[in-house]
Amino acid sequence: MEEYTHQADKFVFHVRKDLLYSRDEVWVKAEGDHVRVGVTDFAQRRGGDIVFAEISKKGTHVKRGEPLGSYETVKVVQDILSPVDGVITEINPIIDSKPEIINKDPYESGWLAVMKSESGVEGLLSAEEYFELMKVKVAEELKKIRGM
């Protein structure tokens, strides 16, 4: 897959060009009237090693901007905010027993859920738009780390 890459210090961040993105660090792959979602490479790197992930049950209705699940790292528990209005129709069975797959392969085998979208993908960012936003977020994180 084609992607944008951004290097900052020792970190390299990847943004897939074939996906859409929310400002809340969730990627979206349109699949007809459904969307497959997962956390971005930036989100999983910022949080560190994921030790636990939980997604709401199949059949749960979630509004855009509301939590559809969460993940836990050694540093933080992070809500995963839904990028669309919709109903969860499928949950990645791997993440229950191997949540670290989200760190290893966030855009493929580390996907989180499939949702039947009720709101479409309007308002989501293109890969190019998200890449520019992510670069700003990376710079902000590096400033925090360096204490500037």
Positions of the model-derived regions?
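A structural signal for short beta-strand/turn segments enriched in small hydrophobics and glycine
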Residues: 59-71, 115
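Generic beta-strand or strand-like secondary-structure segments
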Residues: 67, 87-90
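Acidic, glycine-anchored pre-beta loop/turn
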Residues: 54-63, 86
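Non-catalytic terminal segments and appended small domains
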Residues: 1-58, 91-148
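Short coil-to-beta-strand transition motifs
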Residues: 19-22, 79-87
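Short, Lys/Arg- and Gly-enriched loop/turn segments at beta-strand edges
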Residues: 72-81, 98-101
